């Protein structure tokens, strides 16, 4: 009988539950308030955005100690969630400390990325059949293809949405590159990368045997005369594969397709695989994405590869910020020097800080030590200052293109160079380099200039001024080559004072000419002083015109910008008339022929005699050469 009350209670609870279920939504607890009673709307949470697709970045590095810090810096700065990125890294056959640098970086960043796979191989240091570290024997092609295949296999096993293949000497300076490529929605797509020539990471034509084919489209795309995303038969070096696309399952790097009969070359093998899979490759040039060097020939050295990197860096700085190295690796310090000169002067207007900063960084990357000369600002010159200096324009002078008189900007430029000549005399500097702040440097500038000066010393040439950058104005006849000194000619009529080497005797002659009372633009004054100016009336005002002037051939520096180009700016052309500060000039936009590119030099007027004959090594073909 004791169990009956418990059974009765259980039965009562069951009846209550049944009643509540029958009432459905009408049943309420006393403490619950109806939303209709207090006027509050129910909260509806929006859907969150999709996460970014997952990307595996495959990096193969060999003898890349010099490129890795900047390459990894660019990789770090990609505006893409690192938690959605995996790093697949391999290195082998190194004679430098590539492995140590890569390992240091991976150790420091592995917590940032979703996944890191590291495949180092310390031995051997070279392939048995290679002639140098830049040579690609068959064994190297095979090894690289196997590594790429392993990376592709890992990406598939990890269910990555994309795989990005990128060479360690390709620098993605545009942080949006990965997002932009994904947005193209192509199975295989590459960003067009820039070099110091026409070379890039794509082909527009391919022969039936798989070799490079020249096409008109290539230059149109490479020079941005056509922009977009173009179907091409070949992309290489840096490209993105969408692994979500069904056809991507058919892609392979190794072994080559069973029907493959073309050259055993990694980029050609993969292009064939893409074709057999029915996948179109695409090349995009809608934006500026980054840079790559021109590949070296098989016989070239790692030192030349380092020089290639330096040139890529300094070219990138002309219109864009510097490529900074990774914050997660140690960087080897640089040790600037004066290249054997007593002094190197860089002339810069104080208000042109952007030019000064770019030039200082550019020179530092080349390990060149300079002294900044604060230029005389033509905009700050007034009439009383000109009178105090006894400055008068040479009678009858007119700009050869616009027929205008001298400008205060040109006077400021002259005074800036004059101050350098005075310092050369005061300090008794025997050999001095002078450069302006708006120049771009030729590839291997430092090595070439030092070699030229060594050759001049060995030949015991009597010189006083040597142009290293100029605009040659006499273009119908060749200039006279200097015997026993390669790459040097006797200078004819020239414009521009971008850069020159001057001796103590040369500075003394220029200052001793007392040019203030008969002033010309400095680049007209110099040809007068070496007696090559075509206007005889100007020369009459200067009795002594025996300056010994020469020029490097080919030139070693050029302007960063020319008339009409984005970024072009002139502080000499845009100014005021020399003796009337109320009359402004704006010649750089309408009449600045002086600042335009070098005009065409007649074929029979080229300074070919000054060039050394090519060696057999210079003619070794490169698989990527255009």
Curated annotation (Swiss-Prot):
Tissues in which the protein is found: Expressed in brain and skeletal muscle.
Gene (UniProt): COLGALT2
Pfam family, one: Glyco_transf_25
Region annotation Disordered: where it falls in the sequence: 604-626
A GO MF term: procollagen galactosyltransferase activity
PANTHER family for this protein: PROCOLLAGEN GALACTOSYLTRANSFERASE 2, PROCOLLAGEN-LYSINE,2-OXOGLUTARATE 5-DIOXYGENASE/GLYCOSYLTRANSFERASE 25 FAMILY MEMBER
InterPro entries: Collagen_mod_GT25, Glyco_trans_25, Nucleotide-diphossugar_trans
UniProt-annotated glycosylation sites, renumbered to this chain: 97, 185, 382, 580
GO biological process, one term: collagen fibril organization
Top-level EC class as recorded in UniProt: transferase
Name the record gives this protein: Procollagen galactosyltransferase 2
Recorded GO CC terms: endoplasmic reticulum lumen
